[in-house]
């Protein structure tokens, strides 16, 4: 509920004020993705509270003394129950490519499997 409201506010900013700023001053964002896209991705991936905190940290880095550049949102954390089902790193065999650690599904060990290709399943919002 709160995440939906925050995403609607971000989208409203992107459609109105952000476009006005770009029209008057040109593109001024020092980061890629922009802070509003970063905030939307963080809220989708991490929820309203953690996503808002990550977005606030990003906004605090937006000043003339920071070099900016590519700064992607952090990957989502695993839920504790999902993390408990996964083998710990020291117990896992790094040569075992028959199981996907993210879903636990049995996979053929060919190059097009989602585990080998690095599929993250993330959805990002675009301006």
From Swiss-Prot:
It is a peripheral membrane protein. Its main location: membrane. Keywords: Cell inner membrane, Cell membrane, Membrane. Signal peptide: none annotated. GO terms for cellular component: plasma membrane. It is found in: Cell inner membrane. It comes from the Bacteria. The keyword Cytoplasm does not apply. Residues 88-98 have a biased composition (Basic and acidic residues). The keyword Membrane applies. Residues 71-106 are annotated as: Disordered. Pfam families: YidD. Could be involved in insertion of integral membrane proteins into the membrane. Belongs to the UPF0161 family. This is Putative membrane protein insertion efficiency factor. It comes from Sorangium cellulosum (strain So ce56).
